[in-house]
Each structure stands twice: as C-alpha cells, then as structure tokens.
Amino acid sequence: MRVTWDPAKAAENLRNHRVDLAQAASVLDDPLAIRMEDPAHDEPRFLALGATLAGQILVVVYAYADNEDLRLISAREASRAERRRYAEARR
C-alpha cells in the first residue's frame, strides 16, 4: 500500500501547520498509533495519533483512495491532551 498526497495540499499544510506530509507519513507505520474514524466529513476519513520516525507526536488525517492507497489530507502537531493520551496508551 502506498501513501500519497497532493503536492499543493502538502505545501499548504507546511505553511499552516509547519508539518511536512512526507515526514508525517511515518506516523502510519507507528504500531502504537491510535486510529479512529473522523465523522465530520462526507467522505470516510480517519485520524492517526502517533509518533514519526523522529519522535514527533502528530495527528494525521487520511483517507483510502480508490486504488487502496492511503491519501494524506493533513497533519499537525498533537495537542497537550493528545500527547498525554498517546503516552498513556503506550503504558
């Protein structure tokens, strides 16, 4: 399964959240990531709260593309409460 993203959306995400989607993609490989559905949208979207390879705790929003690839939509640094939730889940 490949992870893809729109280059324009990646540039916007970097401007708005200072998070590179290429680095954020590694959250999806975190075996301890907390995954959940994001019901706030018309299309099925999912959230992953986890760590990048560099140890940065992020929230990544993604969807499944028609060809089964994952399409990253956005990523941002986790809030204090989200970081706490991730740390507690790791115990």
Q: Where in the sequence are the language-model features?
A:
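Ribonuclease/tRNase effector modules and their secretory precursors
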Residues: 1-91
